[in-house]
């Protein structure tokens, strides 16, 4: 009789553990492959920006630029300073100069390829195991 009670208690404990495991969320989010992954990235990264752009398109611009005429001389002098600075010159250099003088993109891994590798790594792991919204938002 004691063995039956022990067996019944172990089955009840095992059942409770199974129910608890089913109620727990998965360690990763949703499995997203291919287009679904790209759509999730676009929705996560671009959604709020698109909504902001839509809101700004419907607002009258007069509110934002009411005192714009008073600041034109100040802005012109700031623009002249910016054009003369070394930062502006760095931004206007050709890609070959920026990437070390190599003439082809294939020869220079640079930042572009590094971010592409991160995207490919997250894409494959998200497809295979699943990923959360916070992992997807790390690409923004």
UniProtKB/Swiss-Prot annotation:
Q: Which residues form the propeptide?
A: 53-116
What CDD domains does the entry give? IlGF_relaxin_like
Keyword vocabulary terms for this entry: Cleavage on pair of basic residues, Disulfide bond, Hormone, Secreted, Signal
Disulfide bond sites: 33-127, 45-140, 126-131
Q: What does this protein do?
A: May play a role in neuropeptide signaling processes. Ligand for LGR7, relaxin-3 receptor-1 and relaxin-3 receptor-2.
Note the subunit structure: Heterodimer of a B chain and an A chain linked by two disulfide bonds.
Q: Quote the protein name from its UniProt record.
A: Relaxin-3
